[in-house]
Design a protein with these regions (language model features):
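Active-site-adjacent structural elements in folded domains
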Residues: 16, 42-48, 87, 102, ...
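Predominantly extracellular beta-rich ligand-binding scaffolds that present long acidic/polar faces
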Residues: 159-261
């Protein structure tokens, strides 16, 4: 769907995978750029915008002070992108329902109605990966967003591999989509936000370090596997296990090298290693000597631990339950702006 209200019925779709022609950007590289304080007039901007292209690499960029996303993939087709070693922070300063990294899919299978997507994919298995024909990889980045999510996969974003990232503020949100493999990330002072997942989505969330309890919204399905994660609070693990998740996960002190300075490598004695977490390269941002001297870095906040997830009061009326919209996640899941 190009827009929420414009659809081609799935029975009329072309089921040939990928693009009709090769007339689109391919194998381009955006590397070692310092991008900041943009979007002074037009607010719907991004430091790097990728759309209807394939195998685009975005590497070692420092991107900050923006009204919206630092890196945005609008339309996942045709996949194969690599987003790595970027430092993206102070984002979504003048808009909402977005992230430091943001994406949407809206591919051939997609509809704003979850039940419609489930019915389409059940009737035509494989339609969900006709457009993002190669995985999109997000690895070894530092993302920061105080007004949204550090990583925000929206509107059917599918076929992603996300690993070895430090999310220092807004956590990681996955709306409906398919085949998102998330491993070995660090979610500082936040958590995993899964709203409105689909049946048999094939999603994995494994070997991650998580600070606060998960924040699910309207979740009837939990993907393929959510397990072997490390929580910094006992409450986080307990809440996950109440949902039937994280049977083999643990909680405790991750033994970060120096959380106050933003060094989130764990010591050789860290209990996080027992659940499969591994240290990774954190050489974020520009590498050019002159640009590195000029580039800013995100403000590192104190590490929060033993933080619970407060739930708002529900009111019953005529057999139905009501509550106020209290979080950015609930606002996004309900499509309220």
């Amino acid at each position: 769907a190009f827009r929420y209200e414009l659809f081609v019925p799935w029975t009329e779709m072309d089921y040939t995978p990928g693009p009709k022609t090769n007339n689109y950007p391919q194998y381009c590289v955006a590397e070692d750029n310092l991008i900041h304080d943009i979007g002074l007039v037009e607010k719907q901007v991004a430091g790097v915008q990728i759309s209807m292209s394939a195998h685009i690499t975005t590497r070692h960029n420092s991107i900050y002070n923006l009204p919206r996303a630092g890196i945005n993939i609008g339309d996942g087709c045709w996949g194969g992108h690599i987003i790595e070693y970027n430092d993206v922070f102070n984002t979504v300063l003048e808009t909402g329902d977005h992230g430091a990294f943001n994406s949407w899919g809206r591919d051939r299978f997609w509809s704003p109605e979850r039940a419609v997507i489930d019915s389409i994919v059940a009737a035509k298995p494989g339609i969900e990966l006709l457009d993002v024909i190669d995985p999109i990889i997000i690895r070894n980045n530092r993302f920061h967003c105080d007004h949204g999510w550090d990583i925000d996969l929206d509107d059917g974003s599918s076929n992603y591999e996300i690993y070895n990232n430090v999310c220092v503020s807004g956590g990681l949100k996955f709306r409906e989509g398919y085949t998102r493999i998330v491993k070995n990330n660090i979610l500082v002072n936040n958590t995993f936000h899964p709203p409105v997942w689909l049946k048999k989505s094939g999603d994995d969330f494994l070997h991650n370090i998580v600070t606060t309890p998960y924040a699910p919204i309207l979740m009837n399905n939990w993907g393929n596997k959510i397990d072997s994660n490390f929580f910094l609070s006992e409450a986080g693990l307990a809440e996950a296990q109440k949902l039937g998740l994280d049977k083999h996960s643990r909680w405790g002190d991750a033994a970060f090298a120096n959380a106050k300075s933003g060094n989130y490598r764990v010591s050789s004695s860290s209990p996080a290693l027992a659940i499969g977490f591994r240290n990774f390269d954190m050489n974020f941002g520009v590498t050019n000597k002159r640009l590195k001297q000029e580039a800013k870095v995100p403000l590192i906040k104190n590490l929060l631990t033993n933080v619970g997830q407060e739930k708002g009061e529900q009111i019953e009326w005529l057999g139905a339950k009501f509550k106020n919209i209290e979080t950015l996640g609930e606002q996004s899941a309900a499509g309220l702006h």
